[in-house]
Regions:
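N-terminal catalytic cores of peptidoglycan-degrading enzymes
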Residues: 2-162
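Solvent-exposed, acidic/flexible segments
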Residues: 102, 134, 165, 180-188
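Soluble periplasmic/extracytoplasmic beta-strand elements of cell-envelope proteins
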Residues: 108, 142, 171-173, 210
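Short strand-loop junctions, especially beta-strand C-caps/beta-turns
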Residues: 112, 175-177
Length: 249
């Protein structure tokens, strides 16, 4: 075969192979592009689903992603609020430091341990610590013998009541008529109502209601420590009150 014709055939075969290679590269590039586009679409889909889930969680539990103070603001919370006599303490290092709390994760029940004392009397004791410097002590609320509720510290400020749980709990001091520490009916009713309202306010359940005893082992509140059945009933009553507040007839 003449050398010129052979060279032409070789050149033609080479051109065909080059075209095939270009076609393969083109197809490969197209496949990669399509795969990349699919991955991008899948990524956006997953991101969208995550954002929707996060939005749902945030609507139902606004503080889920943060460790900052927040309150639930609904008609049910407003309607369930008990009568509260707001008598805030004077800012001072011994009973009202004005330190901000973290996200509220619990309600702590205390008893005053001074039989017959009144709610305002206990509030005034906390107020007096700014002058006596006797100790550091306070409570967000005090429930009195007639069912009155006195607020001493805003719920977004730390009260000196529950040791290492001061920063993530709201404290309730409760008055009692005698040394048994048992609460009378008026005090008990207000305790249940106040605790239920606070649970709704901070998106908590009755399981988040604890005793001072559960934090430190201190016999406080005495009657609820010595009578577990009474404590269990209190939390059940709080649960019932919350259900009524959420679904009023």
């Amino acid at each position: 075969m003449p050398e010129g014709i052979l060279e032409q055939k070789k050149g033609g075969a080479k051109n065909v192979q080059m075209k095939r290679n270009r076609k393969r590269r083109t197809l490969s590039a197209v496949k990669k592009k399509r795969k990349t586009q699919r991955n991008i679409r899948l990524g956006f889909l997953i991101l969208g689903i995550v954002l929707v889930v996060m939005l749902i969680i945030k609507i139902n539990n606004p503080g889920f992603f943060f460790n900052k103070y927040y309150e639930v603001d609904t008609k049910a919370v407003d309607a369930s609020k008990p009568d509260i006599d707001v008598e805030l303490l004077t800012p001072n290092p011994y009973s009202r430091s004005q330190e901000k709390t973290d996200k509220i994760t619990g309600i702590v029940i205390h008893y005053t341990a001074n039989p017959g004392a009144t709610a305002i009397g206990n509030r005034n004791y906390f107020e007096g610590l700014k002058d006596s410097h006797e100790t550091k002590a306070s409570s967000n609320f005090v429930v009195g013998l007639n069912g009155e509720i006195v607020q001493c510290i805003p719920t977004w400020e730390v009260a000196y009541a529950s040791n290492d749980r001061n920063y993530d709990t709201v404290s309730i001091e409760c008055c009692h008529p005698d040394a048994t520490g048992k609460f009378n009916d008026a005090t008990y009713r207000s305790m249940v109502q106040l605790t239920a309202w606070l649970c709704l306010k901070f998106n908590l359940t009755e399981e988040d209601v604890i005793r001072h005893y559960d934090v430190t082992g201190k016999i406080c509140p005495k009657y609820f420590v010595e009578n577990e059945g009474a404590w269990d009933q209190f939390r059940k009553d709080v649960k019932s009150a919350m259900a009524m507040d959420k679904n009023p007839e």
